[in-house]
Amino acid sequence: MSGKHYKGPEVSCCIKYFIFGFNVIFWFLGIAFLGIGLWAWNEKGVLSNISSITDLGGFDPVWLFLVVGGVMFILGFAGCIGALRENTFLLKFFSVFLGIIFFLELTAGVLAFVFKDWIKDQLYFFINNNIRAYRDDIDLQNLIDFTQEYWQCCGAFGADDWNLNIYFNCTDSNASRERCGVPFSCCTKDPAEDVINTQCGYDARQKPEVDQQIVIYTKGCVPQFEKWLQDNLTIVAGIFIGIALLQIFGICLAQNLVSDIEAVRASW
């Protein structure tokens, strides 16, 4: 007479190692971002003089790497170790942290839609504040140059915003050779030229507006960004929805694994 053995609850290996594998990648990406951020700060001498963090008048792009890298590192660590060691505390922390990020993203999206005019004004102030600090930090300078080249724009709402910078303003007291000019990233590109002419923006704003349009981009970066957003709204919305679904999926998997672990422990 053969007896039937009762098979108790088990932890799903598929869910466990899927969460582990996904978060290992996330963890290493976080370490890479943090490493890039710390390396950039070391190159600037920030690590040897922490007080210099507050010296920059504009936005330091290195903060993006440090913040994003820090969040990815914490999430990756909690998800990876929590799944591998079947640690319910870390898995619950992973779920809650991911849920908070999802809630903040959702809130930011709603607020951006409701207060879009206010967001537009803040973006204008943000860009102009960084225009003032254009020469203060090489990373900020590269970010502004990339933005203006990519969007084919100049300043927040136009080339005259560069009057805010001490090197490019048109005042009589400005002895800079760049006086009444714009950075090279504002210049229209000639496909026949392989070498970038870094002096192409000199004296550009002293010319009549009709002549300016031939030499430099006259549209501001805020209107150009709005236009790009309208033209690519479906793609942008799809990306955000995809990220949101991945976050929900991650929360559900982590909670499912927690339930399996607690069920197994309860059967002991």
Swiss-Prot record:
Main location as per UniProt: membrane
UniProt membrane topology term: Multi-pass membrane protein
Oligomeric and partner information: Interacts with ADAM10; the interaction influences ADAM10 substrate specificity, endocytosis and turnover.
PROSITE patterns xrefs: TM4_1
Gene Ontology biological-process annotations: regulation of membrane protein ectodomain proteolysis
Cystines in this chain: 153-221, 154-186, 170-180, 187-200
Function: Part of TspanC8 subgroup, composed of 6 members that interact with the transmembrane metalloprotease ADAM10. This interaction is required for ADAM10 exit from the endoplasmic reticulum and for enzymatic maturation and trafficking to the cell surface as well as substrate specificity. Different TspanC8/ADAM10 complexes have distinct substrates. Promotes ADAM10-mediated cleavage of CD44. Seems to regulate VE-cadherin expression in endothelial cells probably through interaction with ADAM10, promoting leukocyte transmigration.
UniProt organism field: Bos taurus
Full protein name: Tetraspanin-5
Gene3D superfamilies, sorted: Tetraspanin (1.10.1450.10)
Glycosylation sites (chain numbering): 49, 169, 174, 232
The record's account of how the chain is modified after translation: Palmitoylated.
Gene Ontology, cellular component aspect: plasma membrane
Signal sequence range: none
Coiled-coil features, chain-numbered ranges: none
Keywords: Cell membrane, Disulfide bond, Glycoprotein, Membrane, Transmembrane, Transmembrane helix
Lineage: Eukaryota, Metazoa, Chordata, Craniata, Vertebrata
Localization in the cell: Cell membrane
InterPro entries found in the cross-reference section: Tetraspanin/Peripherin (IPR018499), Tetraspanin_animals (IPR000301), Tetraspanin_CS (IPR018503), Tetraspanin_EC2_sf (IPR008952)
Keyword Aminoacyl-tRNA synthetase: no
Sequence ranges on the Extracellular membrane side: 39-61, 114-232
Family listed: Belongs to the tetraspanin (TM4SF) family.
